[in-house]
Regions:
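N-terminal secretory signal peptides
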Residues: 1-58
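Metal-dependent phosphoesterase/phosphodiesterase active-site architecture
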Residues: 2-4, 88-214, 220-221, 264-293, ...
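N-terminal export signals
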Residues: 52-53, 62-82
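Active-site-adjacent structural elements in enzyme catalytic domains
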Residues: 156, 224-247, 251-254, 298, ...
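Active-site glycine-centered loops adjacent to acidic/histidine catalytic or metal-binding residues
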Residues: 165, 226-227, 314-315, 479, ...
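Metal-dependent catalytic neighborhoods of phosphoester/phosphodiester hydrolases
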Residues: 225-245, 320-331, 485-487, 514-519
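Active-site-proximal segments of metal-dependent phosphoesterases and phosphodiesterases across multiple
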Residues: 445-507
Length: 608
């Protein structure tokens, strides 16, 4: 039976509807362009789809356009349009009635990239950011036509937010490989020490949204798609849960009186913000900022999300460095992570050899990395040991999300259940809206490597879930993309193509916006919140009541102002600086915002 049209609920979504069974040897993956980066057949779903009375007619709870046809076009996109090309949406914002009886005056475009986006100004190697023109909405019709009257008929089904690749990072962690900067710009980023302040500002932006930017419908939840943390570290995991659930965070480990990372090591290879040293970053315009490191490690106050949130695991959450085999509570990597030595510099030739091995998958277990660290011990800086830097196992990860302190707006476990913890699986199903199911997958490779994998057992579990909930639309979430999942990715694409009610595969990992049609569904990949342009995405599913559906995607930035002031080291000032440093990072990849058709879109689908 095809999914039925219903309006999105104003109440929070349910807890997971099913808990997967064992996932032996799940595997792990990457941190977008950096190193890094299933369980056995699960039990049947713990409950069958609930049967509800049929929808009482086509006019039921449909969106009512109160501001005229121009406003409708602005919110729902042009009535016609070919593939990624399309006329921009009008700036007029409509008033509309949304599920739950609450009228949304003006579809909430404010705070989205529809109205403005950070853009560089001026000349010189270090460019300041200002507010540039917004990105127009593009109507994409590769999978279905765009009916001329769809805006007037449209009925919202679901509205939620995607966070991906936050990379909350302990910049003093001993296992980090900043010394590979010459091989890959993602080994070290000058903005990294501000990741927590930046993520808190993103939460503030979501909390300020009045509803979905396209429909005005109430947002039901936030779903992360992995690389929530950077170093598979207990401290970073605590920061992540506190950022999303609310509380005070001190983004610092080791000795609170001193900074023991590469930004205070006296080497010209890295930006030394508090020093007069003429390092390679100051040579291209990076400022000298007295008090920067002290401010970066200062306590941050986070309001936490007002919405329920669900987590998906990425390779940096699961693997040391995002690319080496999962660490146990004991062993070399665990001991080194919590130990008193940190390597700051490596001859370029040695670094190149190690990086080639990582890229080519020759060192998934980290043998070469281990040998290197042992051989270079006498060249390392002595640092303050800290048990909070210990690696996190899958069970640690699940139980950390289930702690009372991590609850926030819920649900308990943020998708994961005690059964997941017992079985060691990191995939689950959850309800986004009455007629929309979400499926969070684990695409990491626990035996090492930053690329993705979907094992046979997990595919079998997903196939059963999709069959059990065939009367609801399906949205699949994972960290890795179809092009970065060499094992099981093709099979997953085939499964989704063969499932009429599967509408989208939503992911991250590549740190780049990209939206691709796959015959019957869309793949939506979203840029990270660590590399510029530092984005998240809202997604809104609409029934056009003409035999088609629309999936609206709208990019958002953090609430931090685009303009920065180098003298402002407040929490908000640091969040602004986080974005500007990312734009100017030497060697950073440009073009991560993607093309117009990868940003703010209306994606048409045939209704199954």
């Amino acid at each position: 039976m095809s999914p039925r049209s219903r309006s999105a609920p104003s109440a929070p979504p349910d807890s997971p509807t099913t808990a997967p069974t064992a996932a032996p040897g799940a595997p792990p993956g990457n941190r977008a362009a950096v190193p890094g980066p299933d369980g056995p057949d699960g039990a049947p779903p713990d409950r069958a789809p609930r049967r509800r009375p049929p929808s009482p007619g086509p006019g039921r709870r449909r969106v009512l356009v109160l501001a005229g046809s121009a406003g409708a076009a602005a919110a729902l996109g042009p009535a016609t349009g070919a593939s990624p090309a399309a006329a921009p949406a009008s700036g007029t914002r409509p008033q509309r009635r949304v599920p739950g009886g609450r009228a949304a005056v003006d579809a909430p475009h404010t705070g989205t990239t529809l109205t403005g986006v950070a853009a560089p100004s001026g000349d010189g190697p270090f460019r300041r950011l200002v507010t540039g023109p917004g990105w127009a909405r593009v109507v994409r019709t590769e999978l279905a036509r765009a009916g001329a009257r769809r805006a007037a008929r449209a009925e919202p089904l679901a509205s939620f937010v995607q966070f991906t690749d936050l990379h909350l990072v302990d910049v003093q962690h001993p296992l980090r490989y900043e010394y590979l900067r010459a091989q890959t710009a993602s080994a070290w980023r000058p903005q990294e020490s501000l990741s927590v302040a930046g993520a808190v500002s993103l939460v503030e932006r979501v909390n300020a949204l009045a509803g979905g930017p396209a429909t005005g419908a109430s947002l039901s939840c936030v779903v992360t798609t992995g690389d929530n943390t950077d170093n598979n570290s207990r401290a970073e995991l605590e920061w992540f849960t506190t950022v999303l659930s609310g509380g005070r965070i001190t983004p610092d480990t080791g000795d609170p009186r001193i900074h023991e990372g590469v930004q205070d090591c006296g080497l010209p290879d890295f930006w030394q913000p508090d020093s007069d040293l003429r390092d390679r970053d100051k040579a291209v315009g990076f400022p000298r900022l007295r008090g920067f490191l002290r401010a970066a490690g200062r306590q941050v106050a986070g309001p936490g999300l007002k919405l329920p949130w669900y987590a998906t695991v990425g390779n940096h959450d699961a693997l040391p460095g995002g690319c080496f085999a999962a660490a146990d509570a004991r062993g070399f990597f665990a001991d080194f992570a919590t130990g008193d030595r940190k390597l700051m510099r490596l001859p370029e030739e040695q670094g190149a050899r190690l990086w080639r091995a990582v890229e080519r998958g020759r060192d998934p277990g980290g043998r070469l990395f281990t040998e290197l660290l042992r051989a270079e011990r006498r060249h390392m800086r002595k640092v303050t040991p800290d048990p909070a830097r210990a690696p996190v196992t899958p069970r640690d990860y699940i139980r950390a999300l289930a702690r009372p302190q991590a609850l926030g707006p819920g649900p308990a476990g943020h998708g994961y259940t005690e059964e997941n913890a017992v079985e060691g699986t990191l995939y689950y199903a959850f309800r986004i809206a009455p007629d929309v199911m979400g499926y969070s997958l684990d695409t990491t490779r626990r035996d090492g490597h930053y690329t993705g994998r979907v094992g046979a057992a997990q595919l079998s579990w997903l196939r059963r879930q999709l069959a059990a909930h065939r009367d609801r639309y399906a949205l699949v979430f994972s960290h890795h993309t179809s092009t970065t999942t060499p094992e099981g990715g093709t099979e997953l694409l085939a499964l989704l193509r063969d499932t009429p009610h599967a509408l989208a595969w939503i992911n991250g990992h590549s740190h780049r916006n990209r939206i691709s049609p796959h015959g019957t569904f869309w793949e939506v990949s979203t840029a990270s919140h660590t590399d510029f342009p530092q984005l998240a995405r809202t997604l809104e599913l609409v029934d056009n009541r003409d035999g088609t559906l629309s999936l609206f995607t709208t990019l958002i930035e953090s609430a931090a102002p685009h303009r920065t002031d180098f003298t402002d080291l407040s929490q908000t000032g640091l969040a602004s600086l986080y974005r500007e440093l990312a734009f100017n990072a030497p060697g950073a990849r440009h073009g991560l915002a993607g093309a117009e058709g990868d940003r703010n879109t209306e994606l048409l689908l045939r209704k199954p």
